[in-house]
């Protein structure tokens, strides 16, 4: 009902029927109601074209008296004052709107104000009314300028970051356009009561009145039509190096020095990656070391392994001690030299049998478990079969890898009870003081011959020297001699 009455009010106002509009408003119609486009009855009255211009002013005055708001905008952002300036409402309608609180500085969505629409319309009286209203509010007009296109139509441009007026097309590019913003000092406002107009003839005054109210001098073209030369750019200096703080850990890194490129290098090694002042170069190639497959010469023991020859025993003492026993041991050996040698140790050192026996003696001396009984010389076959870890010269491999030699500086006991329990302490029944053998001469006048240690060589032979380099707290040779002295004394001799 109200919506229909609203449309009826707009139609009555648009047709200039004041009495019908009064009846609708008295009947309860809303004066500020708009249509689908947001247009109100006051906007319709400002845009309407009546036969009598006085009817428009009476309709606008009546609507304002009924409470119509002049600052309501439609969907395009235009107010009733803008519609009045664009539709040719005249200075009287603009004065009524300004008197009821219309704002002349409001802009629409296109950025144009009521002043711009008045300039587009070319209504000088309305424009003067708007300027007076702006001055009354303390607003200085500095953003309006006009120009005339070659075709004779007027166009308006608004500067200071404002888009051009709506509905105005730009002319051909041949016409000069005012590309500069006009200041208030360059605007010449001509009024009817100008002081300099009395000096002119009446015909000249009429011609000046036909001209626009505003005159904006165009910028003068430069005297020299040649394009100006570009100014030389100031030289750019390299930026100053920043000073690093002492707290920065990367500040202590020395700056990388540039490496001159080498023609002989390949492309990959020539590239370097720099990161935080560090230079990463290509890594050197890795070479295989201590390998029999590499280009290096194999060690001397590798030939013996491949040929199947016997390997020498590794002593715990350094090789420098093999040059000869100390002086104390030499005196002890001189006392322990046997009178008669019944063992095959007196063989020539250069003979093959002596070399084979010396090899067997080395193998026996490595472990006390494989020692032969005193005074007996095993055969080479028995000596090879009795060695559990011996190396066969034909096959070149060990027979029993489970039995290993014990290497150490501790005392090696020959007691069978202690040897059956390896890794434990010796039993308490072992006497630390063995009986002293009787070494007195026998009644036959023949001096007892001391049993020589098994496979003992000549006093000065290298085999004897090589045997004494074993580092034990108690020599196994002395234990064997003490056992031999006890067997020579017999069961009745110790009591003597």
Swiss-Prot record:
Keywords tagged on the record: ANK repeat, Methylation, Phosphoprotein, Repeat
Signal sequence, renumbered to the chain: none
Residue stretches of biased makeup (Pro residues): 218-233
Phosphoprotein listed as a keyword: yes
Listed Pfam families: Ank_2
Annotated spans, Disordered: 147-473
Residues with the Phosphothreonine modification: 316
Modified residues annotated as N5-methylglutamine in this record: 15
Biased composition (Polar residues): 147-162, 180-191
Superkingdom per UniProt: Eukaryota
Compositional bias per record (Basic and acidic residues), positions renumbered to this chain: 204-214
Protein modification: Methylated at Gln-15 by N6AMT1.
Start and stop residues of the ANK repeats: 4-33, 37-72, 76-106, 110-139
Compositional bias per record (Basic residues), positions renumbered to this chain: 234-243, 463-473
Gene Ontology CC entries for this record: pi-body
PANTHER family: ANK_REP_REGION DOMAIN-CONTAINING PROTEIN (PTHR24156), ANKYRIN REPEAT DOMAIN 34A (PTHR24156:SF4)
Family statement: Belongs to the ANKRD34 family.
Protein name: Ankyrin repeat domain-containing protein 34A
UniProt organism field: Homo sapiens (Human)
């Amino acid at each position: 009902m109200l919506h229909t009455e609203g449309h009826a009010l707009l139609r009555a106002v648009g047709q200039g029927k004041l009495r019908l509009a009064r009846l609708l408003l008295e009947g309860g119609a809303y004066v500020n109601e708009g249509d689908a486009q947001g247009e109100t009855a006051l906007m319709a009255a400002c845009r309407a074209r009546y036969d009598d211009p006085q009817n428009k002013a009476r309709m606008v005055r009546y609507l304002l008296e009924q409470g119509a708001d002049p600052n309501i905008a439609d969907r395009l952002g235009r107010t009733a004052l803008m519609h009045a300036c664009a539709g040719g409402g005249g200075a009287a309608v603009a004065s009524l709107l300004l008197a009821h609180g219309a704002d002349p500085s409001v802009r629409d969505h296109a950025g144009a104000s009521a002043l711009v629409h008045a300039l587009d319309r070319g209504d000088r009286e309305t424009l003067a009314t708007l300027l007076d209203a702006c001055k009354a509010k303390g607003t200085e007009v500095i953003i309006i300028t006009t120009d005339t296109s070659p075709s004779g139509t007027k166009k308006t441009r608004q500067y200071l970051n404002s888009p051009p007026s709506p509905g105005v097309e730009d002319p051909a590019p041949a016409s000069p356009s005012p590309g500069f913003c006009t200041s208030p000092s360059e605007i010449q406002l001509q009024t009817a009561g100008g002081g300099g107009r009395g000096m002119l003839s009446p015909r000249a005054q009429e011609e000046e009145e036909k001209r626009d109210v505003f005159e904006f001098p165009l910028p003068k073209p430069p005297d020299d039509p040649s394009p100006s030369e570009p100014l030389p750019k100031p030289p750019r200096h390299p930026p100053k190096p920043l000073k690093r703080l002492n707290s920065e850990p990367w500040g202590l890194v020395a700056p990388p020095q540039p490496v001159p490129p080498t023609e002989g290098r390949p492309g990959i090694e020539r590239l370097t990656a720099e990161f935080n002042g560090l230079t990463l170069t290509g890594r050197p190639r890795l070479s295989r070391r201590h390998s029999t497959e590499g280009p290096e010469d194999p060690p001397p023991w590798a030939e013996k392994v491949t040929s199947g020859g016997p390997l020498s025993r590794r002593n715990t003492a350094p090789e420098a001690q093999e040059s000869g026993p100390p002086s104390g041991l030499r005196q002890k050996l001189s006392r322990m030299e046997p009178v008669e040698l019944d063992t095959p140790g007196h063989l020539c050192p250069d003979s093959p049998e002596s070399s084979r026996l010396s090899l067997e003696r080395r193998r026996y001396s490595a472990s006390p478990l494989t020692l032969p009984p005193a005074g007996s010389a095993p055969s080479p076959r028995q000596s090879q079969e009795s060695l559990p870890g011996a190396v066969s010269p034909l096959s070149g491999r060990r027979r029993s890898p489970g039995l290993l030699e014990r290497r150490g500086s501790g005392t090696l006991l020959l007691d069978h009870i202690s040897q059956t329990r390896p890794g434990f302490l010796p039993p308490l029944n072992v006497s630390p003081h063995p009986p002293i053998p009787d070494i007195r001469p026998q009644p036959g006048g023949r001096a007892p011959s001391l049993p020589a240690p098994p496979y003992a060589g000549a006093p000065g032979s290298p085999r004897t020297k090589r045997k004494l380099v074993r580092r034990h707290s108690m020599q196994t040779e002395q234990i064997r001699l003490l056992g031999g002295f006890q067997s020579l004394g017999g069961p009745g001799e110790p009591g003597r």
